[in-house]
């Protein structure tokens, strides 16, 4: 047993922290409670053996969401001395890349990582709408409009055989790129449909073979490999 009167050296403290980080569950912080909830459901379908080892933190009482709020949350975790491995996982859009720029270039503990949802082939040639055009233009929307709903399955993005278009909104000067997003109503429809998709897959595993889990699997792979490299 450790003698409480014995001083702990910095080296010993670092060693213990490293052991806790390796053995304890991986904490995944997202931009909001909806992302955490949907990714937790996704994990139960694609990687059920990892449930309990990967924890998506639900901060539903958090007053604000988004990438800027996520950056503050990571800083709070670091200041509190959370020893678990902590992964900040953000959207793959212009706003998130801009908001997390400082965090990614700063000095974080070795047990912390910052990642975005990965680029997806589906999003490399995707219909978009400009502010003054009703005719879709196909563009690469990776890193510009890659919110979670874009990763939950092609069949959920389609309506009447057409992909829900990305609407370009604000221009982010620092990245010289526009921010894009699908309509909020469509986002809510996709979230509801995904929950039904998960229920169907859990009740009938064969059903999952006819569903598109490509984007979800790519995100989970990003999580699992986040600590392979600095």
Regions found by a protein language model. Name each.
Residues 1-230:
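Acidic, divalent-metal-binding catalytic cores of TOPRIM
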């Amino acid at each position: 047993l450790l003698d409480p009167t014995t001083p702990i050296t910095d080296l010993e403290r670092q060693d213990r922290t490293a052991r806790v980080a390796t053995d304890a569950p991986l904490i995944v912080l997202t931009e909001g409670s909806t992302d955490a909830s949907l990714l937790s459901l996704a994990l139960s379908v694609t990687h059920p053996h990892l449930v309990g080892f990967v924890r998506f933190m639900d901060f539903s009482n958090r007053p604000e969401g988004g990438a800027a709020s996520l950056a503050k949350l990571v800083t709070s975790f670091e200041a509190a001395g959370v020893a678990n491995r902590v992964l900040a996982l953000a959207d793959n859009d212009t706003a998130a890349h801009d908001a997390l720029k400082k965090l990614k270039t700063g000095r974080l503990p070795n047990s912390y990582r910052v990642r975005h949802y990965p680029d997806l082939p589906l999003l490399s040639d995707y219909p978009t709408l400009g502010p003054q055009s009703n005719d879709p233009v196909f563009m690469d929307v990776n890193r510009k409009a890659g919110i979670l709903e874009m990763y939950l399955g092609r069949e959920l993005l389609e309506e009447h055989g057409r992909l829900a278009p990305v609407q370009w909104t604000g221009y982010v000067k620092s990245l010289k790129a526009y921010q894009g997003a699908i309509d909020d109503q469509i986002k809510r429809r996709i979230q509801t449909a995904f929950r039904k998709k998960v229920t169907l897959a859990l009740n009938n595993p064969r059903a999952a073979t006819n569903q598109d889990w490509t984007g979800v699997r790519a995100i989970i792979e990003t999580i699992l490999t986040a600590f392979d490299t600095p």
